[in-house]
Every structure is written in structure tokens, then in C-alpha cells.
């Protein structure tokens, strides 16, 4: 099992991500130690270093997914949504599950850059899924 994010180099999203990753570590992953996979469209080395430095004990792996921002024509069809949101939604709807980074993982917890944990998580959700097949659909 693993936790994953999809991010870009946007300053506001990175600020949220740093808060989220610290919250994930403090309230969940320091105890359960699942890898954190960050799919991105070109994070700079400096940005990646700052993300890893935020929680030095956490296993964070970065994977480039190329340019997944929709074309102007595609964006015009769905003008109520930002291009970045559309791209993340499209990637998470299927392609993420075929990415080689997920080989060997049975479960994936998808978090947004603005996700956070306000309190400790005392139960391992992945262990719960493994131990109770009625919780799993599919």
C-alpha cells in the first residue's frame, strides 16, 4: 500500500502540500510508515528537496508524469474547472493505476495537496482492508 499526491510547481499548491505531508507524517505515517508517491509534471530539484526536508523520516518518491495539462480546446469544453484540476482528475481516473510506480502495491490512498489530518489516526486503514474482505469493492 502507498499514499499518493498529484502536484505541480504552483506556489500555493506546494505550500498546501508541505502542510499536508507534515500532517500525514505527524498523525499517521510516522507510526505506519507507508511510502508517499508524488506524481508531478516537473518539480524542480530544489522543490523536491524542500518536500523531503519537511519530514526527513518519511519515504517520499517522486515520479514525473510529463505534461498532463489539457489543451486549450479541451479546457474550453470544461471551462468551469481549472486546467490543473482537470489534468489531475483525468490522471487519477485511470492512468495512475497503470503507472509502473504502483507495481507491487495492492492499495493506494489518494490525497490532495490541501488534505490534512487534524488528529492522530490510530487504526491502519490498509490493515483493515486486508483483514476484512467485505470492505473491498471489486
Where are the regions a protein language model picked out?
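Short, charged/polar "capping" segments at the starts of alpha-helices
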Residues: 13, 42-49
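Short, acidic, metal-binding catalytic loop of nucleotide-sugar glycosyltransferases
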Residues: 21-33, 54
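Active-site-proximal specificity loops/subdomain of glycosyltransferases
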Residues: 47, 51-106
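Short beta-strand/loop segment that forms part of the nucleotide-sugar
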Residues: 34-42, 63-68
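Short coil/turn segments at secondary-structure boundaries
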Residues: 16-19, 49-52, 120-124
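Short beta-strand-to-loop acidic/aromatic patch adjacent to the donor-nucleotide binding site
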Residues: 103-118
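N-proximal low-complexity "stem/linker" segments adjacent to membrane-targeting elements
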Residues: 1-22
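Conserved donor-nucleotide/metal-binding helix-loop-beta segment in metal-dependent transferases, i.e.
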Residues: 117-138
